[in-house]
């Protein structure tokens, strides 16, 4: 296949993934709507309700597979072939894949079925923004991006971002669920108790933080030194990545030493998530000096003479 054929294939599978995510969301919403008027203790899952739940899960799995094919096609379309992380479009495409994939992997292990409507809505919305406003033709990478440290650094950052995003959803639902006590119906009735949300959020944060540390404080500086002969350049994205690390460190420190749980911990977690997503998106649009800026054009990172 030619590079152009791979790019067309990638675009087609992005569209397929979007359609499958949309159908999955409809199935999940139908499942939840059938239970909307009953409190959790009175719910009786019918065969039809279970069918829509299974269908939503299957469609989400199919969407993730199509999403993965789109990523592979994007990387194969470049000459030479590369990882699909050269611009904001590709990074968002990869990040949404990780969020959806992490949800599927952790759905049974952590009992996250109740997170389905939010995760699928989030992924579908970001995918639409990515296609409509951020899409760019495949382009070669600059010299600084041709490094094995790029793969290690970005994979770590994406994995941590996926875990932190799921944890942030738990924290937000904790605040909503806790405020809506005592009697709840509809979607909130299916969401676990606040104590469970708090525990799941903590576990996801504990998983993501070491990976984020590895990405920000180890692989990032090594890659920067290799590309620009300096471990730290006071680049806006570097600074905000470190600020994000500090806020998440404060969250985990407060929980482990000061015993923070519940509402206070959830608020700090959401502040941390806000810094994370500002670093991911905001820097690209508010700072034209960032070496990591992917706001427009392919691979904005420049080499230094």
Whereabouts are the PLM-identified features?
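Polytopic transmembrane helical bundles with strong interfacial aromatic enrichment
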Residues: 1-305
